[in-house]
């Protein structure tokens, strides 16, 4: 189905800066809305239920899987994450641009179900910098950091399957690139014809 809103799918290895970039984008562009996923992991830091994620139990997650409530779900770092199809479609139907923060497995599943979804992969500038960021975050033990780096190698190997790639070396530059991708989709013919219908009509463009 052709919705007036766009769907942006943003994936990255842990520590690449995906969440920080998406948060900054949301603060700058009120037309972009975050699709909040469900997860079985515990909240981190200042995270709140319903804002960053819907935090649910394993049993609740199982029930949603059985009810076919997710457009995709995957296991990441020993926890499960799922995306509600209904929530995405309702927001896009209202004309909002929806952004999904998701792992690469989920991103590729979303692309199969939403053919027009725009996929974006965030890369770190180097492996050393990725390790340093994970260590500076101070949230994980040394063993967990090693697991995240191991998983990151698997995730980065999928980068060629994405539409756009942003290297997050300088945050402001990476944010500029992310904003440019979002804006470019709004300038496509179909989007402009819908958003500027009166102008197109006056110019006899149908």
From Swiss-Prot:
CDD domains: GMPK (cd00071). It catalyses: GMP + ATP = GDP + ADP. Keywords: ATP-binding, Cytoplasm, Kinase, Nucleotide-binding, Transferase. SUPFAM superfamilies: P-loop containing nucleoside triphosphate hydrolases. Its EC number is 2.7.4.8. ATP binds at residues 12-19. GO terms for cellular component: cytosol. InterPro entries: GK/Ca_channel_bsu, Guanylate_kin-like_dom, Guanylate_kinase, Guanylate_kinase_CS, P-loop_NTPase. The keyword Kinase applies. It comes from the Bacteria. GO terms for molecular function: ATP binding; guanylate kinase activity. Transmembrane segments: none annotated. It is found in: Cytoplasm. Residues 5-183 form the Guanylate kinase-like domain. Pfam families: Guanylate_kin (PF00625). Belongs to the guanylate kinase family. HAMAP family: Guanylate_kinase. PANTHER family: GUANYLATE KINASE (PTHR23117:SF13), GUANYLATE KINASE-RELATED (PTHR23117). Essential for recycling GMP and indirectly, cGMP. This is Guanylate kinase. It comes from Albidiferax ferrireducens (strain ATCC BAA-621 / DSM 15236 / T118). The lineage of its organism: Bacteria, Pseudomonadati, Pseudomonadota, Betaproteobacteria, Burkholderiales.
